[in-house]
Amino acid sequence: MNFETIIGLEVHVELNTNSKIFSPSSAHFGEDPNANTNVIDWSFPGVLPVMNKGVIDAGIKAALALNMDIHKEMHFDRKNYFYPDNPKAYQISQFDEPIGYNGWIDIKLEDGSTKKIRIERAHLEEDAGKNTHGTDGYSYVDLNRQGVPLIEIVSEADMRSPEEAYAYLTALKEIIQYTGISDVKMEEGSMRVDANISLRPYGQEQFGTKTELKNLNSFSNVRKGLEFEVERQAKLLRSGGVIRQETRRYDEANKGTILMRVKEGAADYRYFPEPDLPLYEIDDAWIDEMRAQLPQFPAQRRAKYEEELGLSAYDASQLTATKVLSDFFETAVSLGGDAKQVSNWLQGEVAQFLNAEGKTIEEIALTPENLVEMIAIIADGTISSKMAKKVFVHLAKNGGSARAYVEKAGLVQISDPAVLVPIIHQVFADNEAAVADFKSGKRNADKAFTGFLMKATKGQANPQVAQQLLAQELQKLRD
């Protein structure tokens, strides 16, 4: 029997506000344990939550970016459960009226076609703290993350393969990153993924029993975990077994999933409206204000780069991988840079430099202005393409004017025949054996003179002009 794979994803995105969702504590990552906490985070008796408006702003932006409807009257709910990293014994979340609902995004499939993936809801909530189990027999609780704002984005079960799930996550991460509401760094926990997967016989309308996957710390592991579950569940069903509704974690070392617990249903959390927070009215003016702050998104930029700038689909995809790179490219083109040349540099020397240095483009001194200037002085013959690599490294490390650096460092290409011809004559005088080989008709003897000339000029001879003048002077030797 063959089975159809059904996948839905729950993605938690940490919002990059300065303070937490309901307390004034810093929400920044990487501080000492419990440094970013106060009495609200500790859940002292009598303390009350205070809503961070910036979190609602971010939620509206996310909902708009994901083509969602927005609840004009929004409230929060209590999700009740006990765990050491949750000192209140409940989480403030949203249940029946999330900030966004009924959305969708398009994903690009391997065959080049697109597929629409529906998004059921996006709700705001507070994050829990972090438990660390020490080797000394104690468990430690760090509440820095407690109360950090999250938006949970829940897809419909529209994905039919691990590859589609990977494509959905890639597209979703791009969109969220472009809004500026999160850096979506999985390695820092600002983007976390839970996957729900079930199988059903082809032709059956009813979904099978789902399994939830956790501990998916990379898109690659999401795909691997789902691939393992497809095989595990299919094998179990074919042998007459029954799939339980359970939570499993992906074990990277063993390349498989391991049972964590039998899955609880929503009723186990006993949701009820949060009594300490009011109803929030989101009017059209607020929505329009947030919409005006949104950028053009990757799909629209890719189409523009292909249709208006003549770039390939591959180049357009690479240039829109991050908003900062895309903005850099667009600024360079707006300053008069040739789109293809700017693209080549960004994907070539710039990308190699960033990888080697472990930096992003905003962390180096290169600017759109000095990159465009460098490309211009390559085009007008001031420097060669080979010399430009040295110029680029200087600009990346120090910034400044490309032309000023070239002139100060003595890197200007020699293109004047009045300068080059005497040097060519000196090359002939210094290499009599090569001249003799050339005059005797020895095969490829003329090729050596190019190297001699470039060495004599320390690589500064204009290659095109040098080749033309060499040919002329060598012809005179024959005559």
From Swiss-Prot:
For the keyword tRNA processing, the answer is no
GO MF, one term, reads: ATP binding
User: Is Ligase a UniProt keyword of this protein?
Assistant: yes
Q: Which reaction does it catalyse?
A: L-glutamyl-tRNA(Gln) + L-glutamine + ATP + H2O = L-glutaminyl-tRNA(Gln) + L-glutamate + ADP + phosphate + H(+); L-aspartyl-tRNA(Asn) + L-glutamine + ATP + H2O = L-asparaginyl-tRNA(Asn) + L-glutamate + ADP + phosphate + 2 H(+)
GO BP term (any one): translation
Enzyme class name: ligase
Q: What superkingdom does the record give?
A: Bacteria
Q: Give the EC number(s) listed in the UniProt record.
A: 6.3.5.-
Keywords (alphabetical) are:
ATP-binding, Ligase, Nucleotide-binding, Protein biosynthesis
Q: Belongs to which family?
A: Belongs to the GatB/GatE family. GatB subfamily.
The UniProt subunit note reads as follows: Heterotrimer of A, B and C subunits.
Chain's role: Allows the formation of correctly charged Asn-tRNA(Asn) or Gln-tRNA(Gln) through the transamidation of misacylated Asp-tRNA(Asn) or Glu-tRNA(Gln) in organisms which lack either or both of asparaginyl-tRNA or glutaminyl-tRNA synthetases. The reaction takes place in the presence of glutamine and ATP through an activated phospho-Asp-tRNA(Asn) or phospho-Glu-tRNA(Gln).
Its protein name is Aspartyl/glutamyl-tRNA(Asn/Gln) amidotransferase subunit B
- From the UniProt record, report the name of the gene that encodes this protein: gatB
